Each structure stands twice: as C-alpha cells, then as structure tokens.
Amino acid sequence: MTKKLQKKIRILYTIPNFNAAGIGKTLINVISRIDKNIFDPYICCRHERGDLFNTAKSLNIPIYISEFTAPMKPRLKGMESVYKLTSFFKKINPDIIHSYNYSDDYSEALAAKLSGIKWIYTKKNMGWGSNAWRIRTKLANAIIPQNQEMVEVFFKGLKKYSLIPIGIDLDEFSNIEKDKTLTEKYNLVNSFPVILTIANIIPIKGIDYLISGFNLINEDFENTKLIIVGEDKTEYADMLKRKVIEMRLNDRIIFTGKQSNVRSYFSIADIFILSSMKTGEGGPISVLEAMASGVLSYGSNVPGIRDQFREFPDQLFESENPGSIANKILHFSRMSNEEKNKRIAVQKEFIRINYSIENEIMRLQQLYVKVFDSKKNTNFNFEESF
C-alpha cells in the first residue's frame, strides 16, 4: 500500500546521451520501474541521437535537450557558465539531480549546490586520476559506487556512499531459445565451443588478448568460433581485424559490429568471456546478462568484474594474459555436462539474489527518500510504500 505524499519527489537524471547501450539501458530500466506514486522523474541529455533515445521518449516523461556541464578552465569563465547552469536547474526545479555522467566533471555538482538542489552521482569506472574526482565527491550529497573495490579505494571512511550494483531484468534473459538465423548467418552449425564477448572494441576491453588466447587453443578444436559483438568503427578495431587476417583466423573470428539485440547472441554461445585490462571496470552489465541467460561465463581478475565472480573464483583469469584465457577455454571444454549445468544454475541464482533490477530499484528509492528527507525533514517511511 502506497503512502500518499503531498508532493512527489522530483528527480532529474542527467546523462550525456543514449548512444551507449549499457549506460542508456541502465537508466531506462530505472525510470521505467521507479514508483511514480512517489517519484516524478525527468531526463536531461545533450542531444537526441542514439539507438535508445526513442526508447527513452516512450517513457512519456519530460526530456530536456541541453548541456548540463561546463568547462571549468579558465576559472572565471567556468564560474560564469556554472551560474548559467544554475538558472537552468532552477527552472526545472528538481529536488534531486542524479548524474549518470561518468566523467570527472564537477561543474554540474557545483551548479546544483548553488541552486539548493541535492546532487547524487553514480561512479561507474575505476578512474581517479584527477583532483576533479575529489571535488565532485566533496560536493555530492550521496555517491553510488558499483563495486566493493570502489568503496575501499575511493570512498573508505565516507558515510555518504551507497553501494548499489546495476540490476538487470531477469525475465528478459530467461528461457532464451536458440536463434537459428544467427546460427546460419555466422555458420555455427557443428561449431564448438562458440565463444562470445560483448564490448565496444576499445583498448581497455582487452580484445587483443582474447584473440591471442583464442589463437592458442584454435587447433585444439575442429571448428571453434569467437564472436565479438560491439562497436567496431575504431582504429583499434581495424588493427584487430588486420591481426585476425594475418593469423589466418578470419573464418573463425567474427566481428558483428554494434548490435541492438544482444539477447539473441547469448542464445548461440557456449562460453562468455570478458577480457578487460587491469584498469578494471565499474560493473559491466554484459557479464550479468550472460550469467542470467544461462551461459557459462569467465572474466578478467580485475576490479568490477571480480565482484561479479566473487562466488566463482575459478572462472576468473589473469588480465592481459592470453595463456590464462586459453586455459579457461580448455577448462570449460573438459567439464562434464553435469558440471556445466550445475555451474550455470548457480550463476543464475547468484544473479537473481544479487543483481536483479528489483533490488537496484528498491535501494535507489530508499536512497532518494533518505536524501530528500535530509532536505525537507519529512520523516517519510519509505517501507510504507510497499
């Protein structure tokens, strides 16, 4: 039963764009499920481009197309721009701004502070090179790290963080039937194992190490395949494609480019591998989706990914080590079907307990009410909303 509020809590979500499926999809999942009896959500992004922008529009909430950050150098000009942002935020008049801008910008936080608006940010990556992150953190009313190592490395001793990992829609990734169209398109009939990775092809994702690891085990199998799903319009991707041709693996390694429906790709995979470099990740959603889809998964032993494999340590491999990746592929191939099925079932249960979208929404809503209460002193008991 929902307790009726005299005023809904107005939340403005800021996000650079809806180009990136991970970030955009995460925000759409949150807004589509947040309790509209209690919260009044809005979006601000920089432009209308991006595969998911139309999906965001279908949420039927106000979307502001505007800049919400400003360069802070030179300082005087930066402060002038911040005051302009202050006017923009005051016109929208949210109670809370939740920033999904994952850069180290602090102009947005400063403008919110000057406007008297509570400001929250989600920390998605393991970057912390500049002093700007410290200023951003100082100005925030609450911080949402996405893995335990962020807490220990960046926020130890702070009381204003809430560890809230990304959640996924379990129903979307359960009982997926094998996509025969993809099987035929990529000539996967009688291929084993079919290895899948989903990541934009940029250096931090370590795809070159995955390719080298695949090359080490290629001759151990009659017809294995590696499918690389993700944005491949980059110089790094072009370099990898040349490398694959030089290795004479272009009939075994498939670059699909960016795909809007990654769900179908899980249906054709035997193994999922995320080979990110030692820099680490925030909380890669592709690993969660793979596990929820019933695909046995392996990942680099790095921050972010380590959290997601905390109950499966033998499914982690040394980052930037092709030999270690090759060993995990062989580890999978030597498993009995009984062992594979057991591990897959445990993975699914782990995701259900720890990474469901319902868990994420519940914890976000509790945080919003806590931050709002600190502003308005309403003493609203969020548990009464259920």
Language-model segments: which ranges?
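Glycosyltransferase donor-sugar binding loop
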Residues: 43-50, 168, 198, 225-239
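Conserved acidic donor-binding segment of nucleotide-sugar-dependent glycosyltransferases
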Residues: 311-323, 331-337
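A conserved, positively charged/aromatic
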Residues: 113-148, 155-156
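A conserved mid-protein helix/loop that constitutes part of the nucleotide-sugar donor-binding site
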Residues: 21-29, 193-219, 226, 238-239, ...
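Short hydrophobic beta-strand element within catalytic cores of glycosyltransferases
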Residues: 45, 296-299
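Active-site donor-binding acidic/aromatic loop of nucleotide-activated sugar
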Residues: 235-238, 250-259, 265, 316
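Short His-centered aromatic/hydrophobic patch
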Residues: 99-105, 123
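A short helix/loop element that forms part of the nucleotide-sugar donor recognition site in Leloir-type
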Residues: 174-188, 241, 337-338, 344
